């Protein structure tokens, strides 16, 4: 009890928002029964965020349209296509894409995990592909002229001995992505 009387825990100024369909309604959870389920990236992101010295909020797509981005530095969108975690049909709203794009242009950081901003029916599968620098070819079109790139290791980017599972069908959207 006296531990908490000493004040708030150390926190840096970075404010992170997790963007999904429910916003605050599903803060820090994935419906309760997905604990330690490897298929849901967001549970691992929540676990990581809970140990970082950052302020974390959970916002919905309606919150984005209402101006919630002015209060955050980083937005994380994670989940598989069509899910409420990734956003599903919320990505069909041009206002959401426009506000996030403008926010990134003005210095915000958008982080996508798994199939962020994914929705079919547009020129890109990831609606934020122009920000992410990557998109997914779902087989609905043929990707001719893919950007060629060399893989260059970046010291300190990943912890020693760790790895990231590859995913087929992804391609760079321009020659500037790193």
Spans of model-derived segments:
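Residue-level signal for short, function-critical loop segments
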Residues: 22-24, 62, 80-81, 116
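The substrate-binding groove and active-site-proximal loops of carbohydrate-active enzymes
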Residues: 29-38, 76-92
